[in-house]
Amino acid sequence: MTDVVSTEAPALSPLEALGQAIVANSAGAITAWSVAFGELNLLGPANRIVQALTYLRDHPDYRFHQLVDLTGVDYPERERRFDVVYHLLSLIKNHRVRLKVQTDEDTAVPSVTPVFPVADWFEREAFDMYGIFFDGHPDLRRILTDYGFHGHPLRKDFPMTGYVEVRYDDELKRVVYEPVKITEFRAFDFLSPWEGAKYALPGDEKAEKRAGDA
């Protein structure tokens, strides 16, 4: 007797079915989906991000009415080094999705402030931290760093020390800007992140003496 082998495709999970339906009905504004760590991820072309978010917000089956966050991710080895990531929430349907588009240092992504006004400060932060441009933003300027700040701190190639230090000069009675000067080098080379540094601190010898007398 031969075993009967089923040729039916395995049933999709609710998230997989949602991703499949979103891509199928998006008219090309969203091109791919995947499920990772229990979350639905969507991918689309950057030049159609406004259409994609409008579709997700207004479609009666999805109703993603809240843009929870917008941020960037830097992959310097890629030609289009930046992911722009949009986190959406549907309170009505109890769904969350993450929509990603890719861009480079010179190509602006359309601003989504006409769709979600809350994106105003989110896009300014992504511009400030990553140097991602947003075409059509009403006021695209830095929001976290100081005036005249050089570079974008969350890029992978930005030095950890920065370029300029800001301090208050008591003699001049004003804030001054100076190039960063590394006056001390510390090598933190621990065998385990749970092991503390073995520094000799004042008073340590007393503790060692008491331990020896015990």
Curated annotation (Swiss-Prot):
Keywords: Cell inner membrane, Cell membrane, Membrane, NAD, Quinone, Translocase, Transport, Ubiquinone. It is found in: Cell inner membrane. The gene is nuoC. Its EC number is 7.1.1.-. InterPro entries: NADH_DH_suC, NADH_quin_OxRdtase_su_C/D-like, NADH_UbQ_OxRdtase_30kDa_su, NADH_UbQ_OxRdtase_CS. It is a peripheral membrane protein. It is an enzyme of class 7 (translocase). It holds the Pfam family Complex1_30kDa. This is NADH-quinone oxidoreductase subunit C. It comes from Caulobacter sp. (strain K31). One of its GO terms (molecular function) is NADH dehydrogenase (ubiquinone) activity. Its main location: membrane. It catalyses: a quinone + NADH + 5 H(+)(in) = a quinol + NAD(+) + 4 H(+)(out). HAMAP family: NDH1_NuoC (MF_01357).
